[in-house]
Amino acid sequence: MLYHYIKIAFRNLLKYKLQSFICIVGLAIGFTSFALSSLWIRYELTYDTFRKDADRIYYVRMESETDDQGLSSVTPYPLARYLKETFPEIEESCNTSAWKTDFLYNEKKYESFDMVMDSATEHMFEIELISGSRDFMIPKSNKIAITDKLAKEVFGTKDPLGEKLKIWSDDMEICAIVKSQDQHSNFPFGILKPSRQTEEWNVAYCQTFIKVR
Protein backbone atom coordinates (compact mmCIF):
# COMPACT_ATOMS: atom_id res chain seq x y z
CA MET A 1 0.00 0.00 0.00
CA LEU A 2 2.77 2.44 0.88
CA TYR A 3 4.55 1.63 -2.37
CA HIS A 4 1.33 2.42 -4.24
CA TYR A 5 1.04 5.85 -2.58
CA ILE A 6 4.67 6.67 -3.37
CA LYS A 7 4.16 5.62 -6.97
CA ILE A 8 1.11 7.89 -7.35
CA ALA A 9 3.00 10.79 -5.75
CA PHE A 10 5.86 10.46 -8.25
CA ARG A 11 3.40 10.26 -11.13
CA ASN A 12 1.77 13.51 -10.02
CA LEU A 13 5.14 15.18 -9.65
CA LEU A 14 6.05 14.22 -13.21
CA LYS A 15 2.63 15.10 -14.56
CA TYR A 16 2.54 18.59 -13.05
CA LYS A 17 6.20 19.51 -13.33
CA LEU A 18 5.91 23.29 -13.03
CA GLN A 19 3.57 23.20 -10.05
CA SER A 20 5.71 20.53 -8.40
CA PHE A 21 8.87 22.58 -8.94
CA ILE A 22 7.27 25.70 -7.43
CA CYS A 23 6.01 23.76 -4.41
CA ILE A 24 9.34 22.03 -3.76
CA VAL A 25 11.34 25.27 -4.11
CA GLY A 26 8.88 27.10 -1.85
CA LEU A 27 9.10 24.36 0.76
CA ALA A 28 12.91 24.40 0.62
CA ILE A 29 12.98 28.19 1.01
CA GLY A 30 10.58 27.96 3.94
CA PHE A 31 12.64 25.33 5.77
CA THR A 32 15.86 27.24 5.08
CA SER A 33 14.36 30.51 6.35
CA PHE A 34 13.11 28.77 9.49
CA ALA A 35 16.52 27.19 10.15
CA LEU A 36 18.42 30.45 9.64
CA SER A 37 15.93 32.38 11.79
CA SER A 38 16.29 29.82 14.58
CA LEU A 39 20.08 30.07 14.44
CA TRP A 40 19.93 33.87 14.50
CA ILE A 41 17.53 33.91 17.47
CA ARG A 42 19.74 31.46 19.35
CA TYR A 43 22.80 33.60 18.54
CA GLU A 44 21.11 36.75 19.86
CA LEU A 45 19.88 35.07 23.04
CA THR A 46 23.29 33.70 24.01
CA TYR A 47 25.09 37.04 24.43
CA ASP A 48 26.93 37.08 27.79
CA THR A 49 25.13 33.99 29.09
CA PHE A 50 28.51 32.62 30.20
CA ARG A 51 28.67 35.19 33.00
CA LYS A 52 27.87 34.26 36.57
CA ASP A 53 24.32 35.29 37.51
CA ALA A 54 23.67 36.34 33.91
CA ASP A 55 19.92 35.94 34.49
CA ARG A 56 20.09 38.67 37.16
CA ILE A 57 21.99 41.26 35.12
CA TYR A 58 19.99 43.82 33.14
CA TYR A 59 20.93 46.46 30.62
CA VAL A 60 19.42 49.86 31.49
CA ARG A 61 18.16 51.95 28.58
CA MET A 62 16.80 55.47 28.69
CA GLU A 63 13.66 56.82 27.02
CA SER A 64 13.77 60.47 26.01
CA GLU A 65 10.78 62.70 26.80
CA THR A 66 12.03 65.63 24.74
CA ASP A 67 12.35 64.07 21.28
CA ASP A 68 11.25 61.12 19.17
CA GLN A 69 14.50 59.18 19.28
CA GLY A 70 12.96 56.44 21.42
CA LEU A 71 15.18 54.29 23.62
CA SER A 72 18.81 55.27 24.04
CA SER A 73 21.61 52.83 24.87
CA VAL A 74 23.68 55.52 26.64
CA THR A 75 22.87 56.94 30.05
CA PRO A 76 24.24 59.59 32.46
CA TYR A 77 27.06 58.45 34.73
CA PRO A 78 25.22 59.20 38.05
CA LEU A 79 22.31 56.93 37.08
CA ALA A 80 24.02 53.71 38.21
CA ARG A 81 24.61 54.97 41.75
CA TYR A 82 21.14 56.53 41.93
CA LEU A 83 19.43 53.27 40.99
CA LYS A 84 21.38 51.26 43.56
CA GLU A 85 20.71 53.78 46.34
CA THR A 86 17.02 54.18 45.48
CA PHE A 87 15.87 50.62 44.80
CA PRO A 88 16.70 47.96 47.42
CA GLU A 89 15.98 45.25 44.83
CA ILE A 90 19.21 46.23 43.06
CA GLU A 91 22.27 44.49 44.48
CA GLU A 92 24.88 46.15 42.26
CA SER A 93 25.12 48.66 39.42
CA CYS A 94 27.92 49.71 37.11
CA ASN A 95 28.88 51.93 34.20
CA THR A 96 30.91 50.92 31.18
CA SER A 97 31.38 51.63 27.49
CA ALA A 98 33.49 50.08 24.76
CA TRP A 99 34.59 50.97 21.26
CA LYS A 100 37.15 49.88 18.71
CA THR A 101 40.31 51.98 18.75
CA ASP A 102 43.75 52.11 17.16
CA PHE A 103 46.98 52.31 19.16
CA LEU A 104 50.71 52.36 18.48
CA TYR A 105 53.57 50.34 19.93
CA ASN A 106 57.06 50.91 18.54
CA GLU A 107 55.48 52.87 15.69
CA LYS A 108 53.43 49.83 14.65
CA LYS A 109 49.67 50.23 14.46
CA TYR A 110 47.29 47.80 16.18
CA GLU A 111 43.55 47.65 16.71
CA SER A 112 41.56 46.53 19.73
CA PHE A 113 38.43 47.22 21.76
CA ASP A 114 38.98 49.88 24.41
CA MET A 115 36.64 49.56 27.41
CA VAL A 116 36.27 52.12 30.17
CA MET A 117 34.63 50.98 33.38
CA ASP A 118 34.11 51.70 37.06
CA SER A 119 35.11 49.44 39.95
CA ALA A 120 31.72 47.72 40.07
CA THR A 121 32.14 46.57 36.46
CA GLU A 122 35.20 44.55 37.45
CA HIS A 123 33.12 42.46 39.85
CA MET A 124 29.92 42.23 37.83
CA PHE A 125 31.70 41.20 34.63
CA GLU A 126 34.19 38.94 36.47
CA ILE A 127 37.36 40.51 35.12
CA GLU A 128 40.20 38.28 36.32
CA LEU A 129 43.61 39.80 37.09
CA ILE A 130 46.48 37.57 35.93
CA SER A 131 49.44 39.77 36.86
CA GLY A 132 50.27 43.33 37.82
CA SER A 133 48.23 45.76 39.91
CA ARG A 134 44.78 47.33 39.81
CA ASP A 135 46.20 50.82 39.36
CA PHE A 136 44.41 50.95 36.01
CA MET A 137 41.22 51.62 38.02
CA ILE A 138 42.61 54.89 39.43
CA PRO A 139 40.67 57.76 37.79
CA LYS A 140 42.63 60.16 35.57
CA SER A 141 45.75 57.99 35.64
CA ASN A 142 47.80 56.93 32.63
CA LYS A 143 47.61 53.26 33.66
CA ILE A 144 45.81 50.61 31.63
CA ALA A 145 45.27 46.86 31.66
CA ILE A 146 45.38 44.65 28.59
CA THR A 147 44.20 41.09 28.06
CA ASP A 148 46.57 38.15 27.82
CA LYS A 149 45.39 37.66 24.23
CA LEU A 150 46.32 41.21 23.22
CA ALA A 151 49.61 40.94 25.14
CA LYS A 152 50.57 37.87 23.10
CA GLU A 153 49.58 39.59 19.84
CA VAL A 154 51.63 42.74 20.51
CA PHE A 155 54.51 41.56 22.71
CA GLY A 156 54.82 37.85 22.01
CA THR A 157 56.73 36.26 24.90
CA LYS A 158 57.98 39.61 26.23
CA ASP A 159 56.63 40.84 29.57
CA PRO A 160 54.35 43.81 28.73
CA LEU A 161 54.18 45.24 32.25
CA GLY A 162 55.66 48.73 32.27
CA GLU A 163 55.51 49.08 28.49
CA LYS A 164 53.63 52.02 26.98
CA LEU A 165 51.02 52.15 24.24
CA LYS A 166 50.13 55.35 22.44
CA ILE A 167 46.34 55.61 22.43
CA TRP A 168 45.17 58.69 20.57
CA SER A 169 47.87 61.15 21.67
CA ASP A 170 48.43 59.75 25.16
CA ASP A 171 51.17 57.40 26.34
CA MET A 172 49.43 54.80 28.49
CA GLU A 173 51.45 52.48 30.74
CA ILE A 174 50.47 48.83 31.05
CA CYS A 175 50.19 47.95 34.74
CA ALA A 176 48.14 44.75 34.57
CA ILE A 177 47.31 41.71 32.47
CA VAL A 178 43.74 40.41 32.70
CA LYS A 179 42.20 37.24 31.35
CA SER A 180 40.65 37.54 27.92
CA GLN A 181 36.92 36.88 27.61
CA ASP A 182 36.58 35.30 24.18
CA GLN A 183 33.05 34.05 24.66
CA HIS A 184 30.01 35.47 22.87
CA SER A 185 29.72 38.93 24.46
CA ASN A 186 28.39 42.42 23.86
CA PHE A 187 31.60 43.71 25.39
CA PRO A 188 34.72 42.36 23.73
CA PHE A 189 37.72 44.17 25.15
CA GLY A 190 41.47 44.21 24.83
CA ILE A 191 42.24 47.37 26.81
CA LEU A 192 40.74 48.46 30.13
CA LYS A 193 40.70 51.98 31.56
CA PRO A 194 38.77 53.74 34.36
CA SER A 195 35.64 55.61 33.31
CA ARG A 196 35.45 59.38 33.45
CA GLN A 197 33.41 60.09 36.57
CA THR A 198 31.01 63.01 36.52
CA GLU A 199 27.93 64.14 38.40
CA GLU A 200 26.32 65.74 35.36
CA TRP A 201 22.91 64.34 34.51
CA ASN A 202 22.62 66.13 31.18
CA VAL A 203 25.54 64.24 29.62
CA ALA A 204 24.89 60.64 28.55
CA TYR A 205 27.93 58.71 27.36
CA CYS A 206 28.08 55.37 29.20
CA GLN A 207 26.11 52.15 29.41
CA THR A 208 24.53 51.22 32.73
CA PHE A 209 23.95 47.72 34.06
CA ILE A 210 22.19 46.54 37.19
CA LYS A 211 22.24 43.24 39.06
CA VAL A 212 19.06 42.42 40.94
CA ARG A 213 18.90 40.40 44.13
Task: Report the location of each language-model feature.
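N-terminal hydrophobic targeting signals that begin at the initiator methionine
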Residues: 1-3
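A short amphipathic helical element positioned immediately N-terminal to and/or at the very start
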Residues: 5-14
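Short, strongly hydrophobic transmembrane alpha-helices
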Residues: 15-43
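Membrane-proximal extracellular/periplasmic loop immediately following the first transmembrane helix
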Residues: 37-102, 204-212
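Short acidic/polar micro-motifs at solvent-exposed secondary-structure junctions
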Residues: 62-72, 95-120, 126-144, 182-184, ...
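Mid-to-C-terminal secondary-structure elements
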Residues: 118-131, 144-213
